A protein has these predicted regions:
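A hydrophobic, multi-pass inner-membrane permease signature
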Residues: 2-310
Length: 310
């Protein structure tokens, strides 16, 4: 009898493994499709960037160009100083904004997670409301330009994106579910201040969360061009994304302007317009794509803990 039961258990276990194997195969196919959906557009953009302008005009965008050319990258190298300046602005904004954003977000999340803080519920609601309603572009523009005087300032690219309600909620959930009150009470009995508890207990236990918030902020700052379009008119303060938008608009304006002279028109015809746009996009993608693998482990674990347990 026991042997028959054991055989049944083995059979059911084998059947379960077969189901899991087929399910894994389905998920693998789905993930491969999603990965290709992310990779193929980047490869396609790169292939366009190394296509000759004549090939693009004659045949349109092709995954395998009929004629290859590096004229797009040579054209951008001639504007190397502007690109280097924009790269410096992007790096500075991303680094400074990420550091400040992580510090403020972690502090807010920790304070709101403490049940001993009497105003935790009220300020949690204050943080949560902007996730549903916001003041709009006009009010933000008035505050940043007339009250804070951030027009043509690098801080106009940093402060508006510094703290996100979504990130604060993730931090609050993480601290509330992963740092028991008993540990904090023990530290307080030993004479530790709140800043000591935060720095020596909370932060060391929240490295995955910090990496997750840092990645969110890094991607947000690096890919942002909207703040530049609102607050920046000085080309020396353009980020890479803003520079790409600026170059694209200038190319379109010159290409569609019938009042230009013959020499300028000939130059525009010979300039790799489409290829230059794609080459600029590749230059923007490379730095952030190289950073992601180093934080992938922390990103996945931190996002899972912060979001699912809440």
């Amino acid at each position: 009898m026991a042997k028959k039961k054991k055989d049944l258990d083995l059979a059911s276990s084998s059947h379960l493994n077969q189901i899991q194997g087929s399910t894994n195969a389905i998920f693998n196919v789905i993930f491969v499709i999603l990965a290709l959906a992310c990779i193929i557009p980047v490869v396609f953009i790169f292939m366009i960037s190394i296509s000759s302008e004549h090939s693009i005009k004659m045949n349109g965008y092709q995954f395998i160009p009929s004629a290859y050319s590096l004229d797009s990258y040579k054209f951008l190298l001639r504007e190397g100083q502007m690109i280097v300046t924009a790269l410096g602005v992007s790096v500075a904004v991303t680094v400074i904004g990420t550091v400040i954003g992580v510090a403020l977000t972690m502090l807010m999340g920790y304070v709101l997670s403490r049940s001993t803080y009497k105003l935790s519920g009220f300020f949690t609601m204050v943080v949560f409301i902007p996730m549903i309603f916001n003041g709009g572009i006009i009010s933000s523009y008035v505050v940043n330009t007339q009250f804070l005087n951030l027009k043509n300032s690098i801080w106009a690219l940093i402060l508006p994106l510094c703290v996100s309600s979504f990130n604060v909620v993730i931090c609050k959930t993480f601290f509330k579910t992963n740092i028991p009150e008993s540990i904090i009470e023990s530290a307080q009995i030993d004479g530790a201040t709140q800043f000591q508890i935060f720095g020596k207990i909370a932060l060391p236990l929240s490295k995955p969360l910090m990496a997750t918030i840092a990645l969110f902020l890094t991607f947000g700052y690096w890919n942002d061009w909207f703040q530049s379009s609102l607050y920046i008119s000085d080309t020396k303060l353009y980020s890479l994304q803003a520079l790409l938008d600026h170059v694209q608009r200038n190319i379109e304006m010159m290409a569609n302007n019938p009042s230009l002279g013959v020499t300028t028109a000939q130059y525009m015809n010979s300039m790799p317009k489409e290829g230059a746009r794609m080459a600029m996009a590749i230059i923007i993608i490379i730095p952030i794509a190289c950073c992601y693998p180093f934080f992938q482990k922390y990103f996945i674990s931190g996002l899972t803990v912060g979001a699912v347990k809440g």
